[in-house]
Regions:
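Short acidic/polar hinge/loop motifs at secondary-structure boundaries
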Residues: 172-174, 190-217, 238, 265
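Extracytoplasmic beta-strand/coil segments of soluble accessory domains associated
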Residues: 133, 150-191, 211
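Outer-membrane beta-barrel translocator/receptor signature
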Residues: 194-196, 209-211, 222-293, 301-308, ...
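Flexible loop and strand-edge segments within Gram-negative outer membrane beta-barrel domains
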Residues: 287-307, 313-375, 382-415
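Short, acidic, small-residue-rich periplasmic hinge/interaction motif at the N-terminus
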Residues: 36-38, 44-50, 79-83, 97-142, ...
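Membrane-embedded beta-barrel scaffold of Gram-negative outer-membrane proteins
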Residues: 265, 374-390, 509, 517, ...
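Gram-negative outer-membrane beta-barrel transporters
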Residues: 478, 576-577, 582-585, 605-696
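C-terminal beta-signal and adjacent terminal beta-strands/loops
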Residues: 587, 631, 677, 686-696, ...
Length: 780
């Protein structure tokens, strides 16, 4: 009887446990899903679920899963780079505890709202950024048949890349007409592109290492310190996103006279857990010398370039991320007399350089406080070593003996280090209902340049140190009104006092299609040698060199800009425009004062002038029909003048206008993609008339003068056809085209060894035929 009673109690207990535990066992469910686009899985899509604020990434098959979800209503948001985000509401209940759903992503008709970082040092949508940020993707660089960064930046509004030496072809970037030393080049957001590296660096960075390039015009010293007066160009290298590879070969024939071979490849591996990945790029280039005027001296130098690098990420734990990249650029460059049978220092005129450049950077980011706060620690380093020769073989027998006993070979070494911390915090309901993202940071930048040619008594030994502290407030006053303000304080070893660089910018969004912006910013340039100052040119039958005035002080700037951005989407069509007015005032502006001759050639001294003004208008127009026809263009009208006339050549009347700066320039790009197999690109670059100094010395140039050179229209096109190899899961693409169809190239060059090597302008190369093949993983 007692045992029966115990058994009855046990059965009752088990029954009660089953009854009360039923809702507990079944009060949780799961959501699984599949993300695709045009029948293809989209891996590494970010899947967010609200209100629990949990994020996962889709796997290599496009699938994701949320486990152990309490019954309730959830909002799922899917976002992926290159696709329009989508949102859906899903209910998990006792009736349907396990939900399986499919999401189809679509590519936007036109990329108008990329996520950018350069304008504020925080990630924001372009339409939400107080500062206009233009984006040039790695894919667009390849469609434009750009071999390097220098060729791609021509297709950005307000930007010009010019070749400034007939012998070595060094380049500089002009933003709103300001010379290269006024622009800050960043690699993954870090200012390690040193002045000496900048001489040839834009040509040494291959396009296949690049994820995208972000461009901010106007003063940026409040975030990036010295030299960001004209603007900032941020080169972002490829990060691994999925397992993939691509191999590309291109052959170029320059005006039926010289060959150019380019081979590059990319290989990417990502772990199954998607917590680590590595991307490798390789590039090789061999270009022959090119002589345009048949004087046996080159207009395009020989190039022998090899580069490689890796970019990687690792997620050691939740909300922690480590990014690391390292690359090596190795280049041999020779221009001058086209003789191969004698050593370099026996040739009539020659510039020979061998560069070995290492660049590395590392970022560690921690997100905390429910993702309202983040801390970023970063370190970046660059080292360039260079062997070089710059010389003219003399005519006089006594000078020949001196030349041969001590030929003008030289050595250069540059090291740049950057270390810093950045803290971001998002304040909710800050004073008004809006949010405010506060950014505070500090960084240290060290740059050491040694450049010497003993034969010329030329010795540059420059070390700069800069400690910067910056504070920024990104305040959403109202849903359609945003105020961005901030200030940076720099302590520079070449400047006696602290440099304060404030900025403020107002963004007003008129509905969803229009953004109005008004910005003010200040900047400075330290009294140091920049890229063009470190270039020894040929002029007047000798060489020319630049020295710094002992009284040189920092240059200051104030910049204003106002813009209207409008984009109107329709069912299958979108069109838009951007109109911007800009004005920059320079105080104590740098200029080169002719300073006579010595036994080696011309001398110039860098001095401070009284002031200068840069102002103008930039207009952009864009449209896209159903992702099959896309048009983009930009045109700039500007006026750049010194306050007082500047003497560029001794004995030639001074002028106020900036040299080598046209008042009108622009570009246009038309891309046709009628189907997934065929593609066509037609692009155009216009360069207006400008003033270029021309020194005497060559046999065909007997007077010093400033020349108002002709305008140029550079038209190019590219055709491509792709074929899918389904068994191998590969795509093979053939492409061909012509650069500079109209052969719009400088038609008058100096002749012989005593030429003025800086008298070069217009398009970088004459008509060039190209063709190639690309093999990559994936599906059409």
């Amino acid at each position: 009887m007692h045992d029966l009673y115990k058994l009855f109690i046990l059965k009752i207990a088990l029954l009660m446990l089953a009854i009360f535990s039923f809702p507990i066992v079944h009060s949780q469910g799961n959501i699984t899903g599949y993300v695709s686009s045009e029948s293809n899985a989209v891996e590494f899509s970010k899947v967010s679920i609200y209100p629990i604020k949990k994020n996962v990434l889709t796997d290599s098959k496009g699938r994701f899963k949320f486990d152990d979800l309490p019954f309730g209503i959830y909002v799922i948001k899917i976002s992926s780079i290159g696709y329009a985000s989508i949102t859906d509401t899903i209910e998990v209940s006792q009736i349907k505890p396990n939900i399986n759903c499919n999401f189809k992503l679509s590519q936007p008709i036109m990329e108008l709202d990329d996520i950018v970082v350069t304008g504020t040092k925080t990630y924001k949508r372009k339409t939400n950024s107080n500062v206009i940020v233009n984006v040039l993707s790695g894919e667009n660089l390849q469609v434009l048949q750009s071999c390097n960064v220098a060729e791609g930046l021509r297709f950005q509004p307000g930007l010009r890349v010019e070749t400034d030496c007939q012998t070595c072809n060094y380049t500089q970037l002009r933003m709103n007409g300001l010379a290269g030393g006024y622009s800050q080049i960043l690699i993954n957001g870090r200012p390690i592109f040193s002045p000496l590296t900048g001489l040839y660096g834009l040509e040494q960075l291959p396009v296949n290492m690049i994820e995208r390039i972000e461009v901010v015009r106007g003063g940026g010293s409040s975030l990036y310190g010295s030299s960001a007066i004209g603007g900032t160009v941020n080169v972002l290298t490829r990060l691994p996103r999925k397992n993939s590879f691509d191999i590309n070969y291109t052959y170029q024939n320059i005006n039926a006279l010289s060959s150019d071979h380019i081979v590059n490849g990319n290989f990417t591996v990502v772990s199954k857990e998607r917590d680590a990945g590595i991307s490798l790029f390789l590039n090789g280039r061999r270009r022959e010398l090119y002589d345009h005027n048949e004087d046996a001296y080159s207009e395009l130098p020989e190039l022998n370039n090899n580069s490689f690098g890796i970019s990687s990420f690792y997620l050691p734990k939740k909300n922690h991320k480590l990014e690391f990249s390292i690359s090596n650029l190795n280049e041999y460059r020779y221009g001058g007399e086209m003789r191969q049978d004698i050593e370099t220092h026996y040739r009539g005129q020659a510039e020979e350089r061998t560069h070995n450049v290492w660049m590395a950077s590392s970022d560690y980011q921690i997100n905390f406080n429910k993702n309202l706060s983040s801390l970023i620690a970063y370190l970046a380093y660059q080292h360039t070593s260079r062997d070089h020769y710059t010389g003219i073989f003399p005519d006089d027998s006594s000078e020949i003996d001196v030349h041969l006993s001590n030929p003008p070979y030289g050595l250069s070494a540059v090291s740049t280090s950057n270390i810093g911390l950045q803290f971001n915090h998002k304040l909710l309901d800050f004073i008004l209902p809006g949010t405010n993202v506060l950014t505070f940071g500090s960084e240290y930048l060290y740059d050491a340049v040694v450049d010497e040619i003993p034969a010329y008594n030329y010795d540059i030994d420059q070390s700069t140190q800069d400690i910067g502290i910056f504070l920024q407030s990104d305040w959403a006053l109202l849903p359609n009104l945003n105020l961005l303000s901030g200030c940076r304080v720099d302590a520079h070893n070449l400047v006696d006092k602290l440099i304060w660089s404030p900025r403020v910018s107002l963004l007003y969004k008129l509905k969803t299609s229009t953004q109005l912006r008004l910005s003010y910013g200040t900047g400075f340039r330290a009294p140091q040698a920049f890229d063009t100052d470190l270039h020894i040119a040929f002029a007047g039958g000798g060489i020319s060199r630049v020295t710094l005035s002992p009284d040189l002080v920092e240059e200051r700037s104030e910049s204003w800009s106002a813009s209207v951005n409008y984009d109107k989407p329709f069912n299958k069509f979108i069109m838009g425009f951007t109109f911007e007015a800009f004005h920059t005032s320079l105080e104590d502006a740098f200029f080169l004062q002719p300073n006579g001759f010595d036994s080696f050639g011309l001398l110039f001294e860098k001095q401070n002038g009284q002031g200068a003004t840069v102002q103008g208008l930039t207009f952009e127009l864009r449209s896209n029909y159903n992702r099959k026809v896309q048009f983009e263009s930009g045109y700039t009208i500007q006026k750049n003048e010194f306050q007082n006339p500047v003497e560029y050549i001794d004995g030639v009347a001074p002028i106020k206008r900036f040299i080598r700066t046209p008042n009108h320039y622009g570009f246009a790009v038309l891309t046709l993609s009628p189907n997934k197999f065929f593609g066509m690109n037609l692009n155009y670059v216009y360069t207006g008339r400008m003033l270029v100094p021309h020194f005497a010395g060559a046999t065909n140039q007997i007077t010093d003068e400033i020349v108002n050179v002709d305008s140029f229209s550079n038209l190019s096109f590219r055709l491509s056809y792709a074929l899918e190899v389904k068994k191998s899961k590969m795509i093979i693409e053939w492409f061909a085209g012509v650069k500079n169809i109209l052969n719009a190239y400088q038609d008058y060059f100096d002749i012989g060894k005593n030429r003025d090597s800086n008298f070069i302008y217009g398009p970088a190369q004459p008509r060039t035929l190209f063709g190639g093949i690309k093999i990559r993983s994936g599906k059409l």
